[in-house]
Amino acid sequence: MAFKSIFSLFSSDLAIDLGTANTLVYAKGRGIVVSEPSIVAINRVTNAVEAVGRDAKDMLGRTPGNIVAIRPMKDGVIANFEVTEKMLQHFIRQAHNGKTWVRPRVVIGIPSEITQVERRAVEDSLYRAKASEVYMVEEAMAAAIGAGLPITEPHGNMVVDVGGGTTDIAVISLSSIVCSRVVRVAGNEMDEAIIQYIKRKYNLLIGERTAEAIKIELGSAYPLDEPLSFEVRGRNLIEGIPKTITITDEEVREALADSVSTIINAVRVALERTPPELSADIVERGIVLTGGGALLKNLDKRLSIETGLPVSLADDPLASVVLGTGKMLSDFNLLKRVKWENTITSGMF
């Protein structure tokens, strides 16, 4: 109880959604204070950080030879420990308006099925980034809380969190994840599918930023009411010169077909593993979509058709995970109920 009262006094406490595509930071009492791409630009010669977040993303595919733009997260886990540490230091400092002496307590969301080694890598990165204590919760649980689902009740709630690196699916009841499924197919995989499709069909090479723009403008999981098209500029692989083509929503849907099918099949697997009583609840309550990938046009409609269940989009799908972890900053009992005690919290750097 004493710890609970102490925890509530710290205004420097932070909640973090450390995503493959984007990192969001929620500061207690202030709301979301950082929402930036998970990208760092590093000078190869000096190893110095040139830019982080949005500024670094603007450099993707446009950097000189001595600067490289790095995504330190891959498939929901840390791929580059050193760069992740630098990125977290930057975002934590940004959340505290440049103050370097603050050592916040941090609640962070992690994919449901990552290994102990991967969990430890996240924890170590945060301690090295000057966190005083680290508490981990599954991203699907955090997303459900952020979406306003009644996770403490004895009823089944199903959430599908489509992020940048992973799609995290969970059925939740009584503050616990009853069954879950994680597939390493999400927004970034869709971008890569678009790059490969255009390369294969048009002999045109495009970059990550262009692929993401195509996905946002034209991407869909089910036919649209009105056809859409988009001008794409890239480099012709045969002639080696810049070229412009026009691509349609139907073509992009074809490019994304495998990724969408993988997500839908994972949802089916999770439903098959769900106990009958909780399945009955899901029939009534439906499935809630969260995460940036959930914004893919008509994904909710396609999933509803494929499963026969009602599917809805969270009010703020991009921020659901960080809003959920943010709620735990003010409610230690909630943090305790979602099994934070299973997380290693010792060690400090």
Predicted regions and their residues:
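Nucleotide/phosphate-binding catalytic cleft detector across ATP-hydrolyzing
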Residues: 1-162, 170-287, 294-349
